[in-house]
UniProtKB/Swiss-Prot annotation:
Protein name: Homeobox protein MSX-1
GO molecular function, one term: transcription cis-regulatory region binding
Protein source organism: Lepilemur edwardsi (Milne-Edwards's sportive lemur)
Gene (name only): MSX1
Post-translational modification: Sumoylated by PIAS1, desumoylated by SENP1. Sumoylation of Lys-9 and Lys-127 not required for interaction with H1-5, transcriptional repression, inhibition of myoblast differentiation, or binding to gene promoters.
Short name of one Pfam family: Homeodomain
InterPro entries: HD, HD_metazoa, Homeobox_CS, Homeodomain-like_sf, Msh_Homeobox_Regulators
Functional summary from the UniProt entry: Acts as a transcriptional repressor. Capable of transcription autoinactivation. Binds to the consensus sequence 5'-C/GTAAT-3' in downstream activin regulatory elements (DARE) in the gene promoter, thereby repressing the transcription of CGA/alpha-GSU and GNRHR. Represses transcription of myoblast differentiation factors. Binds to core enhancer regions in target gene promoters of myoblast differentiation factors with binding specificity facilitated by interaction with PIAS1.
Biased segments, Low complexity type: 24-38, 71-91
Length: 297
């Protein structure tokens, strides 16, 4: 309440003074009025104790005085060191983020950079791939996730007739020897021991060679004889119609055929007989004999 009379007195003194001194005292009066108004506003605002401010000196000092302040400070410093180490492992310097305009020294080329890849040899860039053993992770190799590899089936071995290891080579007979052997075989198919010895010496052959040749020639003659007999049997068979047509003929001559036809058309013999339907013969001995099923000799 003391500011109001002070302001009034200042104004009265200002207006009461002569014009020469009022011009010099006007700024000082305005400043005093502003100071009094600011003091009133500060008195009207509620004052906050300095201990409640988070960034005050008391608050900062109180944090250091707490029992767990040292542990928290150590943890913070360790976290900062770990962050700095990770930044260094990633190739980022601590001052590079804060000062982007600062000139940076060229970093060494890594294996995964463009320069590092260009400097690698060609063998390192090309990965060796093996079709037989592809790379697999351990969980893929377990039978739970991947089926067992299919076994390669080897091609079946060719089953050829195996000859004896101690088999003698085949005897190459000359043309003169073959003609003499054929002539002797036509005369006599079986030779005695004396005849075979004499004949083999005349052809400059051993007795075993002559013996084996005669055995083979007799087997060949037997096969040829059986083939000739089969041909004769096939030629002797009459040309009969196939059984698919089912043609059958009654036994007897033309008279029997005519009688059978009349009996099928007319029931009994007589002057006045009506036509009857043909009835198939029933019985074992009344049926016709089919040439398609039996060969008559």
């Amino acid at each position: 309440m003391t500011s109001l009379p002070l302001g009034v007195k200042v104004e009265d003194s200002a207006f009461g003074k002569p014009a020469g001194g009022g011009a010099s005292q006007a700024p000082s009066a305005a400043a005093a009025t502003a100071a009094t108004m600011g003091a009133d506003e500060e008195g009207a605002k509620p004052k906050v104790p300095p201990s409640l401010l988070p960034f005050s000196v008391e608050a900062l000092m109180a944090d250091h005085r707490k029992p767990g302040a040292k542990e928290s400070a150590l943890a913070a410093s360790e976290g900062a060191q770990a962050a700095g180490g990770s930044a260094q492992s990633l190739g980022v310097r601590p001052g590079s983020l804060g000062a982007p305009d600062a000139p940076s020294s060229p970093r060494p080329l890594g294996h995964f950079s463009v320069g590092g890849l260009l400097k690698l040899p060609e063998d390192a860039l090309i990965k060796a791939e093996s079709p037989e053993k592809p790379e697999r992770t351990p969980w893929m190799q377990s039978p739970r996730f991947s089926p067992p590899p299919a076994r390669r089936l080897s091609p079946p071995a060719c089953t050829l007739r195996k000859h004896k290891t101690n088999r003698k080579p085949r005897t190459p007979f000359t043309t003169a020897q073959l003609l003499a052997l054929e002539r002797k075989f036509r005369q006599k198919q079986y030779l005695s021991i004396a005849e075979r010895a004499e004949f083999s010496s005349s052809l400059s052959l051993t007795e075993t060679q002559v013996k084996i040749w005669f055995q083979n020639r007799r087997a060949k003659a037997k096969r040829l004889q059986e083939a000739e007999l089969e041909k004769l049997k096939m030629a002797a068979k009459p040309m009969l119609p196939p059984a698919a047509f089912g043609l059958s003929f009654p036994l007897g001559g033309p008279a029997a055929v005519a009688a059978a036809a009349g009996a099928s058309l007319y029931g009994a013999s007589g002057p006045f007989q009506r036509a009857a339907l043909p009835v198939a013969p029933v019985g074992l001995y009344t049926a016709h004999v089919g040439y398609s099923m039996y060969h008559l000799t």
